[in-house]
């Protein structure tokens, strides 16, 4: 059976950040991946978009280019940002799904949000700058402007 073609263009992400080893192996076994180059992407898409069933990335896809994508079923936006670089109206009319990988980043985003919240509440970032300048404060004085999360 002929494998569906996936254009792999996750930049600035890399596939190992999006898929577990097991899922990446499964992806590669079930689909033929065409890796988009970092340079000359427009030429690459002009030559290959007609082959693709799926696109994994968020490349610039105008109506003209999308009109050549006769097999395209879905664009998986790996940034989950839905920038204005894809003709979404055309995709909607042609029933090309555009989906996001948001759950992939849920834990890292939650962790950084918690870290930033604690830094703000405990004034860690300013304490660090004071330490670097040799002006750090100790004891009660270092906690006067701090707050608790609870």
What does each model-found stretch correspond to?
Residues 1-99:
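An N-terminal-biased, well-structured beta-alpha scaffold segment characteristic
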């Amino acid at each position: 059976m002929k494998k569906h073609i996936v254009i792999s263009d996750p930049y600035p992400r890399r596939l190992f950040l999006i898929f577990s080893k097991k899922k990446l192996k499964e992806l590669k076994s079930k689909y033929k991946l065409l890796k988009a180059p970092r340079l000359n992407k427009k030429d690459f898409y002009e030559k290959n978009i007609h082959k693709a069933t799926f696109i994994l990335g968020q490349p610039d896809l105008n109506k003209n280019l999308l009109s050549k994508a006769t097999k395209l079923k879905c664009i998986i936006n790996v940034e989950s940002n839905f920038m204005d670089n894809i003709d979404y109206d055309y995709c909607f009319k042609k029933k090309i799904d555009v989906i996001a990988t948001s759950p992939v980043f849920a834990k890292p985003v939650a962790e950084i949000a918690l870290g930033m919240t604690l830094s703000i509440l405990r004034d860690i970032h300013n304490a660090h700058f004071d330490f670097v300048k040799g002006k750090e404060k100790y004891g009660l004085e270092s906690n006067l402007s701090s707050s608790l999360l609870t």
